Curated annotation (Swiss-Prot):
This is Sulfate/thiosulfate import ATP-binding protein CysA 2. Residues 3-235 form the ABC transporter domain. The gene is cysA2. One of its GO terms (molecular function) is ABC-type sulfate transporter activity. Its EC number is 7.3.2.3. The complex is composed of two ATP-binding proteins (CysA), two transmembrane proteins (CysT and CysW) and a solute-binding protein (CysP). It comes from Agrobacterium fabrum (strain C58 / ATCC 33970). Its main location: membrane. The lineage of its organism: Bacteria, Pseudomonadati, Pseudomonadota, Alphaproteobacteria, Hyphomicrobiales. GO terms for cellular component: ATP-binding cassette (ABC) transporter complex.
Amino acid sequence: MKIRLENVVKTFDTFRAVRDVSLDIESGELLALLGPSGSGKTTILRMVAGLEYSDGGRIFFGDEDATNIPVRDRGVGFVFQHYALFPHMTLHENIAFGMKVSKVKRDKAAIDARVKELLNLVKLDGLGDRFPAQISGGQRQRVALARALSVDPKVLLLDEPFGALDANVRRDLRRWLREIHDSLGITTIFVTHDQEEALDLADRVVILNQGGIVQQGTPKEVCRQPNSSFVMRFLGDANRVSGVARGGKVYVGENELPFSYTQGDGAVDIYARPGDLEWEDLHEGIPASVERVLDRAGERRVIASTDGGDILEFDVPPENDVTAGDRGSVIIRRAKIFPVA
């Protein structure tokens, strides 16, 4: 099922939550809506579901204008962060509930067979008689997904589905959800503020800020070609160095960096990931002093300050004996350069 949003707008009182958003989601695509709190990602998801109505624009499911279609008639499956399971029902009863109230009537035998099939799909065979309180958080989220799939939705919507779980469980469930999606091929949209989650799971990532789309693309595209300092900072650890562009070249103090810049002269911000920086005892890069060294498994994280006052973080091999107070240079191997706003 292809989904299309055309110039969608949503306002709560005087707050514009979604600003003129247009977006195409291809049939069978796994799409992540990624952004900080207040970026509009959950509001967009709720409008696709029919839980909120837009104040302007249109939403299409395939060729059908679904803008004003009630939620129960849209054919969506919804998974929330906090499971929303019925505590007084067994897992079997929770999964069966949607089928019992659906417009598509099934007899008990058909419902029981479908529940068994779904319990197998989410790897909870034999646990149908248990109650939600008797299983782990990760297992509850699997039940929530099985319940969403029980009504054979055209579209699967997930709102921060792993946010309430610990890091190791989240990683396991991410791999599992990707496998489920690949086997079923249902158009899936999920909301997250977790950059790693979006980049690990999605075919395409839509990055939002202040109610609008700021960039979209494959995980590779948005990571390698961030189009703004916001995207660069939001997607992961980023060091910022103040510089100047002059005559197509970039300088930090008197040090010329090995990058060209064609967007005119003036102040620029130079962004680099920790892995794009190297520490040298020789003074061939940006002069800096080591402020602190954090020892971690397999690496050492160095925090250094440049003579211009910028704070940089980068990693060195565990055998490197750099220590606080050392003087040296930071060499920037790769960077993204943006004009100062």
